[in-house]
Amino acid sequence: MGDVEKGKKIFVQKCAQCHTVEKGGKHKTGPNLHGLFGRKTGQAPGFSYTDANKNKGITWGEETLMEYLENPKKYIPGTKMIFAGIKKTGERADLIAYLKKATKE
């Protein structure tokens, strides 16, 4: 998997405007990501998801995030996440490594 420190920088640059990762963190434009791994799409308590997210029915893990983060709108058509995606596999791996650590602390 990727480099946690590099992944943290990517999160700060590309994700933190809309997401938090800490336990009890607030929802912003996007949901708080604490407990992300092993959770089904559209299930963060208290966040208003699109039906597309609620109905996707996959469980978040390294493989599903790798595919989703490349092109969110292709993976979940109808998502309200406006982020275009991260094309470089290495950058996605770094971000996922960071998320894996940060969302369970």
From Swiss-Prot:
Heme c binds at C15, C18, H19, M81. It holds the Pfam family Cytochrom_C. The keyword Acetylation applies. Binds 1 heme c group covalently per subunit. Phosphorylation at Tyr-49 and Tyr-98 both reduce by half the turnover in the reaction with cytochrome c oxidase, down-regulating mitochondrial respiration. Its main location: mitochondrion. The keyword Secreted does not apply. GO terms for biological process: apoptotic process; mitochondrial electron transport, cytochrome c to oxygen; mitochondrial electron transport, ubiquinol to cytochrome c. The modification N-acetylglycine is found at G2. It is found in: Mitochondrion intermembrane space. It comes from the Eukaryota. Gene3D superfamilies: Cytochrome c-like domain. Electron carrier protein. The oxidized form of the cytochrome c heme group can accept an electron from the heme group of the cytochrome c1 subunit of cytochrome reductase. Cytochrome c then transfers this electron to the cytochrome oxidase complex, the final protein carrier in the mitochondrial electron-transport chain. Plays a role in apoptosis. Suppression of the anti-apoptotic members or activation of the pro-apoptotic members of the Bcl-2 family leads to altered mitochondrial membrane permeability resulting in release of cytochrome c into the cytosol. Binding of cytochrome c to Apaf-1 triggers the activation of caspase-9, which then accelerates apoptosis by activating other caspases. Belongs to the cytochrome c family. This is Cytochrome c. It comes from Canis lupus familiaris. The lineage of its organism: Eukaryota, Metazoa, Chordata, Craniata, Vertebrata.
